UniProtKB/Swiss-Prot annotation:
CDD domains: Trefoil (cd00111)
SUPFAM superfamilies: Trefoil
Keyword Disulfide bond listed: yes
Source organism of the structure: Xenopus laevis
Entry function: Could be involved in defense against microbial infections. Protects the epithelia from external environment.
Disulphide bond pairs: 162-188, 172-187, 182-199, 307-333, 317-332, 327-344, 354-380, 364-379, 374-391, 526-552, 536-551, 546-563, 573-599, 583-598, 593-610, 621-647, 631-646, 641-658
Any one of the GO CC terms: extracellular space
Principal subcellular localisation of the protein: secreted
Name of the protein in its database record: Integumentary mucin C.1
GO biological process per UniProt: maintenance of gastrointestinal epithelium
Length: 662
């Protein structure tokens, strides 16, 4: 112990530290631990604290039986010295000192550990702290610098790619798209500018590719800086540098998204469209026109030529925000490769099927129906001709309706025989006795016996009333004849078997009932409490008149409204009082208003009671953009325009946005 204290004092160390080291050494010796005495000699030589720490670490490794090379590498890197000193000193001393001390006596063990504990305790802590701080600071600073540089590069490149003039922007997405939705499409978003395109495509893809290449070359530099250190902190830094590569990979799906849009353009051409033309006749021949399920499930592949047409000649088949799958289930074409055009449109055969003369159109909807509502019914829509039906059935649909009419229930064959001839034909009549035959004949001579008729000139005017399914028909015949011989008239019931050879012109009249196609409502649309029914008709309205208006009819519950609006129609009449457009005149009654197919609500005073529904209001604003009549002034807002009772639509450029209703 005195020797250890003297050595500590000689090296210029603190006396307190030496005392603490001695006490710790004595405890170590008492516990029977093994220490490496040469450490005191190394510390006494006045070497740098870092070298002492490296030597202590090497001795500890040697005592544990590890290879000295592992400790040499980090010590050399942190201290900046040659590995020869640490390697030579640490293993040799530890190998010689450790066994001798373990097998020696107690005094030798107590004398040696004191400087070892004092020398190794303080420098090791300092060296470890210095090494840890230096090792962690370098790679972390380099990684953060690389990240900030990458962020500035990506933000500047994004600004460069999104710097497009408003006049040259190509729309990316639908009207009203949010910034988040726009960014998901990898497009640019700029809400500045009145009436411009807010979500638009980037500049040509060549610039985008150069940007990705620059980012890829910068990422490996950051990883090389982190690899230089081998401490645990360095491992953490390497993990943080990895997301830089992930960012580069994340930019790659931009190209994939663009390719997907190109693929979609070709695929829809060969999918569904002849469904409407081919399937409809098959369905209607077998079943009634109510069976529309087969039409929806059957899918017929169309040729690519069905969808090849000029973008300006496309006829809209969908509605705002329709998806590709929804469009194809309707049997229409889908092509989203050309911006600012109709993406879901009819095929050539469907366009031809909707070419119906205005006078021959069969109504498919109701007054004021919108284009979207009409197309959801799979009907044709054409608002270019005023005063005609805008929503109507196609040619194939009308033909299918006529084919489905069964002649057994609607056709009543009635035969009226008018004889204008002089016949000299022997007639053999067999009369079967029946109890239901009633004959009333006004003639000069009435007989019911078989006779041979002589030449007679007879003019017969007969009125025959024949029920549809009655076998025996009572006949009332009034015969006015000028003859020289008595006239014999024989009345034969329908069940009589008659074999006669006569030359008599016969006129057959066939009555065919053609059922007019009416708008059908599903049972779910008419299910509501009787007290909540909104009157759709007027006193004395019939069921056919009610259904022709597209309303529900139920006469099973007395003292309730029998003709009432369906649930969608009730919702369609939910118009805010400030947005109502007058459909009538001052003092109009509810019946007069409903005869105009308008909504009536007298519950709120000081507002319009008879007004157009939401769909009717939209239909009045859905005319061709080129025929709009300006209702506002430059810079008018949408709220001011609507308060004027006018239409507002800013989706089409170079036309009035605030315009009068049609």
């Amino acid at each position: 112990a005195p020797t250890t204290a003297a050595a500590v004092a000689a090296t210029g160390k603190d006396t307190t530290a030496a005392a603490e080291g001695s006490a710790a050494a004595e405890k170590t010796a008492a516990a029977g631990e093994v220490s490496a005495p040469p450490t005191a000699a190394v510390a006494a030589t006045g070497e740098d604290a870092t070298t002492a720490a490296a030597t202590a670490a090497a001795e500890t490794t040697a005592a544990a039986g590890e290879a000295p090379t592992t400790t040499t590498a980090p010590a050399t890197t942190a201290a900046g010295k040659a590995p020869t000193t640490a390697a030579a000193t640490a293993p040799t001393t530890a190998a010689a000192g450790a066994p001798t001390t373990a097998t020696g006596k107690a005094p030798a063990t107590a004398a040696a550990p004191v400087p070892t504990t004092a020398a190794s305790k303080a420098p090791t802590t300092a060296a470890a702290a210095t090494h840890s701080t230096a090792a962690a600071a370098a790679p972390t600073t380099a990684a953060s610098a690389a990240k900030s540089k990458e962020r500035s590069t990506s933000s500047s490149s994004e600004e460069e790619h999104c710097h497009v003039k408003p006049s040259k922007r190509e729309m990316c997405g639908s009207k009203g798209i949010t910034k988040k939705q726009c960014k998901k499409k990898n497009c640019c978003f700029d809400p500045k500018g009145h009436g411009g395109i807010h979500c638009f495509h980037r500049k040509p893809k060549g610039h985008s590719h150069e940007e990705h290449t620059t980012t890829t070359t910068k990422a490996p530099t950051t990883i090389q800086i982190a690899t230089t250190t081998t401490t645990p902190t360095t491992t953490t830094t390497t993990t943080k540098a990895t997301p830089t590569t992930t960012t580069t990979t994340k930019a790659t799906p931009t190209t994939t998204t663009t390719t997907k849009a190109t693929t979609t353009t070709t695929t829809p051409t060969t999918t569904t469209t002849t469904t409407k033309a081919t399937t409809t006749p098959t369905t209607t021949t077998t079943t009634t026109p109510t069976t529309t399920t087969t039409k929806a499930t059957t899918t017929t592949t169309t040729t690519s030529g069905e969808c090849k047409m000029e973008p300006s000649k496309r006829e809209d088949c969908g509605y705002s925000g329709i998806t590709e799958s929804q469009c194809r289930t309707k049997g229409c074409c889908f092509d989203s490769s050309i911006p600012q055009t109709k993406w879901c449109f009819y095929t050539l055969s469907q366009v031809a099927d909707c070419k119906v003369e205005p006078s021959q159109r069969v109504d498919c909807g109701f007054r004021g129906i919108t284009a979207d509502q009409c197309r959801q019914k799979n009907c044709c829509f054409d608002s270019s001709i005023s005063g005609t039906k805008w929503c109507f059935y196609s040619t194939s649909q009308v033909a299918a309706t006529k084919t489905t009419t069964t002649p057994t229930t609607t056709t009543t064959p009635t035969t009226t025989t008018t004889t204008k001839a002089t016949t000299t034909t022997p007639t053999t009549t067999t009369t079967t006795p029946t109890t239901t035959t009633t004959t009333t004949t006004t003639t000069k001579a009435t007989t019911t016996t078989p006779t041979t008729t002589t030449p007679t000139t007879t003019t017969t005017k007969a009125t025959t009333t024949t029920p549809t399914t009655t076998t025996t028909t009572p006949t009332t015949t009034t015969t006015k004849a000028t003859t020289t011989t008595p006239t014999t008239t024989t009345t034969t019931p329908t069940t009589t078997t008659t074999k006669a050879t006569t030359t008599t012109p016969t006129t057959t009249t066939t009555t065919t009932t053609t059922t007019k196609a009416t708008t059908t409502t599903t049972s779910g649309e008419c299910k509501m409490e009787p007290s909540k029914r909104a009157d759709c008709g007027y006193p004395g309205i019939t069921e056919s008149q009610c259904r022709s208006k597209g309303c529900c009819f139920d006469s099973s519950i007395p003292q309730t409204k029998w003709c009432f609006y369906s649930l969608p129609q009730v919702a369609d009449c939910k118009v805010a009082p400030s947005s109502r457009v007058d459909c009538g005149f001052g003092g109009i009654t509810a019946d007069q208003c409903r005869q105009r197919n308008c909504c009536f609500d007298s519950s709120i005073s000081g507002t319009k009671w008879c007004f157009y529904s939401t769909s009717q209001g939209n239909a009045m604003c859905s005319g061709p953009p080129t025929k709009r009549r300006d209702c506002g002034y430059p810079g008018i807002s949408s709220s001011v325009c609507i308060n004027r009772g006018c239409c507002w639509d800013n989706s089409v450029m170079n036309v009035p946005w605030c315009f009068y209703r049609t």
